[in-house]
Amino acid sequence: TTLFRSPDNERQLFDFYITAEEEDFSETLLNKTISEDSNYDEMIKPKLQNWELDRVSLIDKILRKMALTEFIHIPTVPTKVSINEYLDISKLYSTPRSREFINGILDKLMNEMKSSGKIIKTGRGLIE
C-alpha cells in the first residue's frame, strides 16, 4: 500500500510503500488526534502554568496531542518511547525551549493517566 490513499484517487503522494501495520498505525494516529482535539485541549489546559492555550505554538500543541493519542489509543507503543519520539521531533520543528515545555506537560499527563487507568499498554515488555 502507499503512504496515503484515497478511494476516489489512487495516485501516490509518496513513491514508497508501507506495511498494513504501519498504515493502520498512521491512520489511527491521524484520525484519533483530530477527533480527540477538544478533549486533549481540556486535558492540557490545567497543566499550562502561567500560559494560555492560544499562546502555545501550533507545532507544540500538535506534538502533545499526537503523543496523547499514542498514550491512549496505541497500546503497543510504550509511553516513554512516545515522549522521546515527540521530543526529537520538537528539536527539528519547534523552538529550543519547546522540548522542556512539551516534556513537562506530557510527563504530568502520563503519570496522571496511568494512575487513573486511562493508559493501558499490552504486549511483551510494554506493561510499565
Tell where the protein language model's regions lie, with residue ranges:
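Short helix-capping/linker segments at secondary-structure and domain boundaries
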Residues: 7-8, 72-78
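Amphipathic alpha-helical elements of HEAT/ARM-like alpha-solenoid repeat scaffolds that form extended
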Residues: 23-31, 60-68, 106
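C-terminal subdomains that position terminal phosphate/3'-OH groups for nucleotidyl transfer/ligation
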Residues: 15-20, 63
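Long, contiguous alpha-helical segments
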Residues: 9-13, 43-51
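C-terminal non-catalytic interaction appendages of large macromolecular assemblies
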Residues: 53-65, 75-128
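Short, small-residue-biased leader/transition segments that mark boundaries at the very start
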Residues: 2-3
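Elongated, mostly alpha-helical coiled-coil "stalk/stator" tethers of large membrane protein machines
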Residues: 8, 18-27, 45
